[in-house]
């Protein structure tokens, strides 16, 4: 794709001489038709939709022509920072975060007030799967229907988009071309996954061991809810461990300050909620730790995707316990391979090789448990070799159990 001289100057300044696979694929179709782009985290999806969009904006027209909807403030700030850099190479390009502005490009959250304008020709939803969650899908539908009055071209992007979500989009926006460069959506080739096994329930001892092991690297710790986040930050404070944090209940300025520190390499340890797992580029961070597992399985992929961006390696750790065993097994069933890690008596990490890997039994379903109980109930009267027959029946039951449901990837 041939870009304008302004964009070419920006690319030259940033020494971008080669485009990623998702960018090359998107440039052929966008913004000439509706598209859905699916590619792994850190693959360059933002530039994939943003550069062609900027090429089509009429900078002599002082009104909104394109809208980018994002799910979090942090992703909004990141895109604004990128646009601030690009604007230096344009004479009259304007952008804003509010529809009250006459800016040519609006970067907005879905829950902010948005106004319909007939001049909007391009609408992008970044991290679209978050808009399709139960809490926000109705608002998303209303937004799409409103902007469809102007007959714009739509673009939807995410690293994880499954069949049911894909059908929702295609039902609302017809003639949509799917670009799927991430068929194995649960697997990132540059992320190594680890399970930390503890002899006690004290996860904090495991966290301290990880911080010690990666003391020369920058680390993100994810928490699935406000309660666990506050508990962890209190533990870190009590142990005089320096950290920054980003989560929903912080003030706007606190979130903005810590976000700026993290993106400018001013923080060694960052504790965040899952709000921070989407689309954020942190070039200096290489380790992700899940203090607990997210409620939605796919969020784990987005957590681990904060590292291993643009061809750099990353590590993702989680802690094993009885409570998250079933969630862990779901991730394993999706094809994610975990290396087991144990904690030595002196508080160091021991990475287990394939020969001495710990094994974790997959949990039985409620139906399987009922069937096993029924098998055992048959043998109330003791007969010769009854234990052998009983064991064989149970083994046959487990061998013939249904495979876990797999998502259809596109």
Swiss-Prot record:
GO terms for cellular component: cytosol. SMART domains: DEXDc, HELICc. Pfam families: DEAD, Helicase_C. CDD domains: SF2_C_DEAD. Keywords: ATP-binding, Helicase, Hydrolase, Nucleotide-binding, RNA-binding. It catalyses: ATP + H2O = ADP + phosphate + H(+). The keyword Electron transport does not apply. A motif (DEID box) lies at residues 126-129. ATP binds at residues 39-46. It comes from the Bacteria. Residues 190-357 form the Helicase C-terminal domain. Its EC number is 3.6.4.13. It is an enzyme of class 3 (hydrolase). Residues 26-179 form the Helicase ATP-binding domain. One of its GO terms (molecular function) is RNA helicase activity. Belongs to the DEAD box helicase family. This is Probable ATP-dependent RNA helicase MG308. It comes from Mycoplasma genitalium (strain ATCC 33530 / DSM 19775 / NCTC 10195 / G37) (Mycoplasmoides genitalium). The lineage of its organism: Bacteria, Bacillati, Mycoplasmatota, Mycoplasmoidales, Mycoplasmoidaceae.
């Amino acid at each position: 794709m041939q870009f304008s001289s302004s964009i070419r100057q920006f690319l030259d300044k940033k020494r971008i001489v080669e485009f990623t696979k998702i960018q090359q694929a998107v440039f052929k179709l966008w913004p000439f038709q509706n598209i859905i782009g699916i590619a792994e985290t850190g693959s360059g999806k933002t530039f994939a939709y943003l550069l062609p969009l900027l090429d089509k904006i009429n900078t002599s027209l002082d009104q909104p022509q394109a809208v980018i909807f994002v799910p979090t403030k942090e992703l909004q700030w990141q895109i604004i920072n990128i646009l601030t850099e690009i604007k230096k190479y344009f004479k009259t390009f304007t952008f804003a975060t509010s529809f009250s502005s006459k800016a040519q490009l609006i970067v907005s959250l879905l829950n902010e007030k948005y106004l319909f304008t007939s001049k909007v020709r391009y609408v992008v939803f970044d991290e679209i799967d978050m808009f399709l969650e139960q809490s926000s899908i109705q608002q998303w539908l209303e937004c799409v229907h409103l902007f469809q009055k102007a007959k714009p071209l739509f673009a939807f992007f995410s690293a994880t988009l499954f069949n049911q979500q894909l059908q929702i989009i295609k039902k609302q926006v017809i003639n949509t071309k799917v670009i799927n460069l991430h068929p194995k959506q649960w697997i990132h080739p540059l992320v190594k996954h680890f399970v930390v096994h503890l002899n006690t329930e004290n996860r904090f001892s495991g966290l301290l061991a990880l911080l010690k092991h990666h003391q020369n690297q920058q680390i993100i710790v994810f928490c699935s809810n406000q309660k666990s986040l506050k508990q962890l930050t209190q533990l870190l404070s009590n142990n005089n461990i320096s950290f920054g944090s980003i989560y929903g209940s912080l003030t706007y300025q606190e979130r903005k300050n810590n976000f700026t520190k993290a993106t400018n390499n001013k923080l060694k340890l960052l504790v965040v909620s899952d709000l921070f797992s989407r689309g954020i580029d942190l070039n200096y961070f290489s380790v992700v730790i899940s203090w607990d597992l997210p409620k939605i399985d796919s969020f784990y992929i987005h957590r681990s995707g904060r590292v291993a961006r643009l061809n750099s390696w990353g590590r993702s750790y989680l802690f094993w316990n009885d409570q998250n065993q079933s969630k862990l097994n779901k991730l394993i069933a999706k094809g994610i391979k975990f290396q087991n890690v144990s904690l030595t008596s002196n508080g160091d990490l021991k990475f287990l090789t394939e020969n001495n890997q710990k094994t974790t039994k997959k949990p039985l379903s409620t139906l399987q448990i009922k069937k096993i109980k029924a098998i055992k109930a048959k043998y109330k009267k003791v007969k010769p070799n009854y234990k052998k027959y009983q064991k064989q029946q149970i083994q046959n039951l487990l061998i013939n159990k249904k495979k876990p449901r797999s998502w259809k990837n596109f």
